[in-house]
Design a protein with these regions (language model features):
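A compositional/biophysical signature of low hydrophobicity enriched in polar/charged and small residues
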Residues: 1-164
Length: 164
């Protein structure tokens, strides 16, 4: 099932959600350990467990953050990953939506630059990657061209960039 991530910079009325220093501190605590108990977070930021729980729920509801399990694709049998640049003829949105529906695609972003879209594809092996790109992505209506960047070695992946 494909989901569209809410724009973290806007709320239902189009304004940016207010993130105070305490909420930022809560986010940073969860970036260090997404399973950290609310009581421990409360101790670190000076709030009660209930207040932390309410703030976390509000941050989730506003689309400011998500709490998810991050897996290692290699340990799950997915031995080939690639970033694919996609150029589109016509409207980008239907192509982006179709790509987001694909099981192998875990990341879709509309870009400005050499490509209209960048997607990340996670596959079992080279044959699976070739089939996904050649038979599924390139055949989508509106796809003009693709360029693949196969991952050879992951050097850094982090979700702890803080709240700046």
């Amino acid at each position: 099932m494909a989901t569209r991530t809410p724009d973290p910079k806007s709320t239902a009325n189009g304004t940016a959600p207010a993130i105070d220093s305490v909420s930022k501190a809560i986010i940073e605590q969860l970036q260090e350990d997404g399973r950290r108990p609310y009581a421990a977070i409360g101790k670190a930021v000076g709030l009660s467990e209930a207040a932390v729980r309410q703030r976390v729920q509000k941050l989730l509801d506003q689309g400011v953050m998500q709490i998810v399990a991050v897996t290692d694709p290699l340990t799950l049998g997915f031995r080939r990953q690639a970033m694919v640049g996609v150029n589109v003829q016509g409207d980008i949105e239907p192509v982006a939506d179709a790509l987001a529906e694909m099981e192998e695609v875990d990341y879709v972003v509309v870009t400005a630059g050499s490509f209209d879209l960048l997607i990340e594809v996670v596959c079992e092996d080279d044959d699976h990657l070739l089939e996904t790109i050649n038979k599924r992505i390139r055949t989508l209506p509106g796809v003009r061209s693709t360029e693949s960047f196969v991952y050879m070695k992951l050097r850094k992946q982090t979700y702890t960039w803080g709240t700046r």
